[in-house]
Every structure is written in C-alpha cells, then in structure tokens.
Amino acid sequence: MQHAPEPGESQSEDSDDSVSDNDDDEEDAQPTSNAYAALLQSLSTVAKQNEHQETHRRKKRKLAGEDLQVAEEPQQKINRNMSNLTEDEPDAVFDGDALDEDPQEDAASDDGVQIRDAVEETQDGFESFEVHFANPDENDLAMRLRRISENQWSAKKLHAAGGRALLQVPCADNTAFDTRKLRSTRDVQLKARLAENAQKVVGQFNDGHEQVIMPSIFGYQDVLFAARTVHNAARMRDITCLHALNHILIGRDRVLKNNAKLAAANDGDDVEYRDQGFTRPKVLFLLETKQACVRVVDSITRLFTFEQQENKKRFLDQFHRPDQAFSDDKPADFRELFEGNDENEFRVGVKLTRKTLKFYSTFYNSDIIFASPLGLRRAIETGDPKKRSGDYDFLSSIEMVIMEQADANLMQNWEHAEFVFEHLNLQPKESHGCDFSRVRPWYLDDNAKHVRQTIVMSAFLTPKINTLWNKHMRNFFGRLKYTPDYSAGVIESLSHGIKGIKQTFWRFESPSHLTDPDARFKYFSSTILPSILRTPKPAEGGPGILMFVPSYLDFTRLRNSLVDVNISYALISEYTDMTDVRKARSHFMNGKHSLLLYSGRAHHFHRFNIRGVKRVVFYGVPENPIFYEELVSMVGKSVERGETSRAEASIRVMFSKWERMELERIVGTKRLSRMVGDKGDVFDFVY
C-alpha cells in the first residue's frame, strides 16, 4: 500500500509510461491575433529545423500585417494529421521504452473508412462540440471571458433529488441556464460507433443526480460532483469515459474530413480549416491508483469495440494486481481504493485509431493520458534533463480533465494536483511539428484553460477542492457544483452501541483561518488537555483515550508538546513502522498507555479497528464523515464488550467556524448555523 510521499520523497516503480516525442495534432485555428504572431515568431526557428527539405506547394496568407509563407506538401500534411506520427526528434522518454510506431500502419487504419465516416456524419450533428470548441461565437466568447476575469457569474439553484446543485454561467442572459433534458444516451449526440454500446453500458439516466449533471457533462460545462460513492462510482466512470471517447472521435473525424478537403483543393483555392491544437493529447484522466486506471481502461473497452489492443498484456502486468484483496471487515470505500494495485506513481499514454487501442504511446503521440498527480508531476519535473524547467508542452492542448477521486488525493499530497493544474494549457515552448495554420484561435490567444472542460469527482467537498473550483474550473460555458443533502448528518445514523453515549462539540474562537492552528493548539492546551489529565484510571485497563488528529502538522505539534506532559501515550501515524503500530495498539488496549495519538492519514491508509477505545477526542472535525462513524463506533464496541459503561464513555470534538463543511456532514445542515453562530460554545448530543 503506497503512502503519499513528502515533497522530496520518491516512489518510483517499473517503467509504465512514456512521455515525449514530436507529434502533430488534431485541432485548428486561424492566426488572426497578435498573440498568434508572437507565438509563431518565437517558435519559427524550431519549426524550420523540423521541416523536410522537399519541393512544397506554397500558400500565402496575411498575418498581423505580414505575409507568412506556409510551405507544405498536401499529402504529407494529410498523413501527419491522420497519424500524428512525425517524430522528428524525441524530446524525452520517461520510464522505459516508448514504442516505435509506423506511420503507414496508422494511416492505413484510419484512412479510407474513417474519412468516409467523417463525411457521412455531418459536423452539424454535434452542436455542443461545434459551439464550444470548433466555432465559438467570437463576441460571446470575449464577453464571457471578460466576465470570468471580473469573477462575475450568474447563478441558479437547480432542483436535485437527494442533493443540491448550483449552476453558474459567466453571462447575464437567463437563456444561458436553459438545458436540454437527457433521459438516456439516446438523447446524447454520440458518434455512431459509440451509440449501441453506450445504450447497453449506460442506458437510462436516473432521476436523481444524473438528471441534474448530465446536461452539464455532455454540454461541456465544468462539473464538480461531490457525491461520489462506492455505489455510483462505476456508473460515473462509464459516463465520463463515454463523453471522453465521443469527444476524441468527433475531433479526429473532423480533422480527417478537412484533410480530405484540403487534398482535393486546387492550387488557387484559398481554404483553411482550424481544427487542431498545439499537441495531440486531448483527454487527461487524473487517477489515484494503478488499479483505478485499469478500471477506466475496462470501461473504455466496453464502450468502444477495438479489434486490437496493442501492449495490453504489458499494461495489465504492470497495472493489474487481482490477488491483493482485503477481508470484509474493511469498509467498502477502503476496499475500492486500495484493493488491487494501489501504487500511486504512474503515467501512461494511450493512442486510439479506428481499430486499435495502443498502450504506451509517447505522450506527444497519445490521445489520452492516464496518470496520478504524483506520477505526472514527476514526469514534468524530471522528464528531460536538457530542460531545466521540465517538459509540459504535452499538456498544452488538453481539452478535458477527469479527476476521479479528489478526496483520496487529499490524503496524499494535494500540492501534486495543484502542480498539474498549474501546468495545463500553457503556451508550448517548442512547435512539436505543429501546423499553425490549423490551430484554433482560442489556443493562440491563450484561452484554452477557459475552453477546457474539467470534471472533478469527490466523496465530499473541502476548502482545497473549493479552491480548485474557484481557480481552475473557469469554463466559459459555465460550471456546475453538486453536493449531497446533509440535512440530518451522520450523527443521527450511528450504530454499534452508541445509543446513550454523550457526544460533545466544543467551539473555540479562531479569528483567522491562517491563525487557526495556533488558536486550536491554545484551546487544547488550556481546556482539553487538563480534562484528559484528570481522567481517572479504572481498576482494570486504562482510560482508553484516543485522540484523532486530521492534520499531520498538528499531529507533529501535539507529539512534541506531550513530551513534557505527565501522561503515558503512544503514537500511530502514517509513517509509523508496523512493528511499532502493533506495540502501540497492544499497550493502549491493556492500559499501559492512557492516550493514543492517531493521525488522519494513518486511518485513511489502514483503517485500524483499535481495541480499548473508551473515549475519543477529535482535535479537528474529520473531512471524511465515515471516519467519524468508524472512530465513534470503536467506543460503542467497547461498551458492548463491557469494557466501559455508557456513563464513562464519551466523544468530544473541537471545532472552529472554519470547519463548516466538515461539521455539516457530521451534525447536519439544520444544526450547522446555530453551532457556528450561537453565543454558546458547547453542544451536547445524546441519542
């Protein structure tokens, strides 16, 4: 089981990925802005070095007051765009052998039938793609981008069974909130090659959250879905994979169709098609474990029937581990996250042709990139020793990001996720064989980050995920946030002998979020710790006080402060050796240690069922409400075993006004305002 490394810690593994090669792409644009001129000038030297020295047909265009000579032999351009395999000089290859690819094989697989499909399926059949990516209205786009820069969002609450949905659009026109109801995949504009399998795999959309969020997902709005569960995870995975595949196929077929038109054009025809980006990769899946990657690939292969899957065995050998399973006494969410291959440093590129799914394609030659935030950061930072700042050009044209388990990534190092988002859709440093005459204008104007669709799924919402929403989910089409209904809170559904045990919530004053750790420690030292020291030791066993500390920084601070306190205690953190863990649990259970300091990440990675717990003190409210249930149930089990009485057992929770989201999930929405805003600072619950 992999723990999150500290910023300087390494967790390398077998070669499982590939990162770079010069590549061509499938997105378009006409250079009509100063930004384009500046970008082209900065890259012209590199571009000229990569061009073949052959006789070219020349076409002249007017660009920002200058004549730009674009020299390309038509058939060479067509082959390059269809196969995206002009690998002039590999920039870097990460972790093992990137596989050689044959341009002729690729062109043959895509050429005939796929061009016919592209011609048969009219571009007008995919309205969302057309107005969002292909031909957005310039005036409307400019207006929306201006409102985004001023943080002006019009908002509307949507009716959502079992949850709350907020739709925001950077537009004052109320018609922007109008959406088409989607009852099943038949109501979604899908490529013909996906429609039948989509109906079999996904079919009808349910009347709960799916009816609310599907128009935003398939309408290319950003979506923050903070209601992911073990039960709906597979379904949400199938839906997002369907959307990603559809997006790739629409864009690819459009490029092939335009290639055919260019090939048929006469020398004097002034034709241009803006249908590409700077580089080929279009979809980025940010996943937590290798096993999660296997599940996504499985979903993709059920939705699209490939005649061949190249290097699939190698992929399964490195990513799939069916023999690693846990017993049923571990909770379902833990098993879903950690069963199978739970390694959390990986990245792998995948390329789609009409008949073949190719694993381990170089990043610049891939349509989809699967990666963990840690693995992708490692690739960017260490990929090419010649580039001191790292290579991230392969992320310049990402049009869709799907982050499947943001809550799990919080328990790793969230800085890795922030790092990845900071490096998305930046202007490339090199040309990578790009045909600038076909790059879309909003790429050249550095607006790709506002056109990109970002879909983030999480079991719950946190301030860090909210920051991601505010900073990186700024789609010009709008954004939707969906959260579950917490009207009751988990406190009303506790079991395992909790009935009759007092649960006390202590609010302390915290004037600033930045100084909250200091205020929390001061309150603990002056109020909570003295009461712990006064706890009488029973005739048999010990007081059984477990202190749960969500933050590792707080854990370290408490550990250091207890050195000078007259109390016997044990420590369990995510970095504690398993031998020491067993010793700490044993001494705590038999009463040798009165206090057990227990970190939030230790519980996340191991979900220990600790014996001898008679009292729990929460140094902070756990972000995951399941943790609260599990820790409180340890007290209930001690009561059921007769190790303590209901009168002696207790639950105490420290909280401040900065923990509203965490507190709401525990006590429920109806109690939240009173507990945060009332004059009183102690709140007792007994069920």
UniProtKB/Swiss-Prot annotation:
Alphabetical keyword list: Nucleus, Ribonucleoprotein, Ribosome biogenesis, rRNA processing
A Pfam entry, by short name: UTP25_NTPase-like
Entry's Gene Ontology BP terms: maturation of SSU-rRNA from tricistronic rRNA transcript (SSU-rRNA, 5.8S rRNA, LSU-rRNA)
InterPro entries: P-loop_NTPase, UTP25, UTP25_C, UTP25_NTPase-like
Main subcellular location of this protein, as a coarse class: nucleus
Localization per record: Nucleus, Nucleolus
One Gene Ontology cellular component annotation held by this UniProt entry: small-subunit processome
Source species: Phaeosphaeria nodorum (strain SN15 / ATCC MYA-4574 / FGSC 10173) (Glume blotch fungus)
Stretches with biased composition (Acidic residues): 11-29, 86-109
Subunit record text: Component of the ribosomal small subunit (SSU) processome composed of at least 40 protein subunits and snoRNA U3.
Assigned protein family: Belongs to the UTP25 family.
Biased composition (Polar residues): 30-48, 76-85
Keyword rRNA processing attributed: yes
Function: DEAD-box RNA helicase-like protein required for pre-18S rRNA processing, specifically at sites A0, A1, and A2.
Protein name stated in the entry: U3 small nucleolar RNA-associated protein 25
Organism domain of life: Eukaryota
